[in-house]
């Protein structure tokens, strides 16, 4: 096989991610790579909060359909946007080395989250972020913020918000930090990220010749950490649009796992932090989810969906 076709969204970040994988493949193999840009449902419907659009795979479905029709061979996703179940004929074949997994406080007026005045307007579409912000500061006004990163930063500069919350990885990949007055990453204890945050997931057609070309992209620590995170979410049957945070942080032979599930308004939540040996990572995400279920996580998520 001497050519691969990547189905990609047309946003600046999606194109950066696809070009990054394109360069990796072309620099490490004899394979030529072509990009095919398209729009997904999540790109087109910009006036509705993601949770209200409903369904999983808002940013992946059209790319998957292109692969299933035989028009493309793979797609590069922010792993946090990738559902835990794949259509028949497609497979998650590689997970890249992770960029910064943290969420960041971004503002033109206030130097830190703690400096926000009472009733400040904070922009985010993520129910996970909304929940964790309101746990800390129930007085904040959390306002839906859609669009690509540049659109969100423009709205911030136009004073629509006192601050916005963004994934650090996207800001770093697009070198946007110098355009921001105040950029402060939350610690992992302050704001637990989404499953897979900071990693790129390579989804491809389930064909051995394609899988063989792509497997060199796999990063062992990324695979271990995101396996824990995705297993946790899969057991809870949670998609990208429910208030679930989970992160596995690897340091040497130790993994710290942080997880949170709750209501979007932050009024009720279940939170835990565990430390395990790297050798024990298999099935740990599922076991931790079982413990959350025994503490009422499924009922909490059902109520969260009704509130969203």
Curated annotation (Swiss-Prot):
Modification type S-(dipyrrolylmethanemethyl)cysteine: residues: 240
Gene Ontology process terms (BP): protoporphyrinogen IX biosynthetic process
Cofactors demanded by this protein: dipyrromethane
One family name in Pfam for this protein: Porphobil_deamC
Cofactor stoichiometry and binding remark: Binds 1 dipyrromethane group covalently.
Keyword Lipoprotein: no
Pathway in which the depicted protein is active: Porphyrin-containing compound metabolism; protoporphyrin-IX biosynthesis; coproporphyrinogen-III from 5-aminolevulinate: step 2/4
Enzyme class: transferase
Annotated S-S bridges: none
One MF term in the entry's GO annotations: hydroxymethylbilane synthase activity
Domain of life where this protein originates: Bacteria
SUPFAM superfamilies: Periplasmic binding protein-like II, Porphobilinogen deaminase (hydroxymethylbilane synthase), C-terminal domain
Known role: Tetrapolymerization of the monopyrrole PBG into the hydroxymethylbilane pre-uroporphyrinogen in several discrete steps.
Additional remarks: The porphobilinogen subunits are added to the dipyrromethane group.
Alphabetical list of NCBIfam families matching this protein: hemC (TIGR00212)
PANTHER family: PORPHOBILINOGEN DEAMINASE
UniProt subunit comment: Monomer.
Cited HAMAP family: Porphobil_deam
Name this polypeptide is given: Porphobilinogen deaminase
Provenance organism: Campylobacter hominis (strain ATCC BAA-381 / DSM 21671 / CCUG 45161 / LMG 19568 / NCTC 13146 / CH001A)
């Amino acid at each position: 096989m001497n050519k691969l076709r990547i189905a990609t969204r047309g946003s600046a970040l999606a194109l950066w991610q696809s070009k990054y994988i394109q360069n990796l493949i072309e620099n490490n193999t004899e394979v030529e790579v072509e990009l095919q840009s398209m729009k997904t449902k999540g790109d087109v419907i910009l006036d509705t909060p993601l949770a209200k659009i409903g369904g999983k795979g808002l940013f992946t479905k059209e790319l998957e359909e292109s692969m299933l029709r035989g028009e493309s061979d793979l797609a590069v996703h922010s792993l946090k946007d990738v559902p835990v179940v794949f259509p028949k004929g497609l497979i998650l074949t590689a997970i890249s080395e992770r960029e910064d997994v943290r969420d960041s406080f971004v503002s033109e007026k206030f130097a830190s989250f703690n400096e926000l005045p009472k009733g400040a307007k904070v922009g985010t579409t993520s129910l996970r972020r909304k929940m964790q912000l309101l746990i800390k500061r129930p007085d904040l006004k959390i306002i839906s913020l859609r669009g690509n990163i540049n659109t969100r930063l423009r709205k911030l500069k136009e004073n629509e918000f006192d601050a916005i919350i963004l994934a650090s990885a996207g800001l770093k990949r697009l070198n946007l930090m110098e355009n921001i007055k105040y950029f402060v990453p939350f610690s992992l204890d302050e704001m637990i990220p989404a499953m897979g945050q900071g990693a790129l997931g390579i989804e491809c057609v389930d064909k051995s010749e394609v899988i063989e070309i792509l497997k060199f992209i796999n990063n062992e620590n990324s695979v271990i950490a995101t396996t824990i995170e995705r297993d946790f979410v899969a057991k809870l049957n949670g998609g990208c649009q429910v208030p679930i945070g989970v992160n596995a942080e690897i340091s040497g032979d130790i993994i710290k796992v942080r997880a949170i599930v709750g209501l979007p308004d932050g009024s009720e939540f279940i939170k835990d932090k565990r430390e395990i040996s790297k050798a024990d990572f298999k099935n740990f995400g599922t076991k931790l989810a079982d413990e959350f279920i025994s503490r009422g996580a499924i009922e909490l998520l059902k109520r969260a969906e009704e509130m969203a």
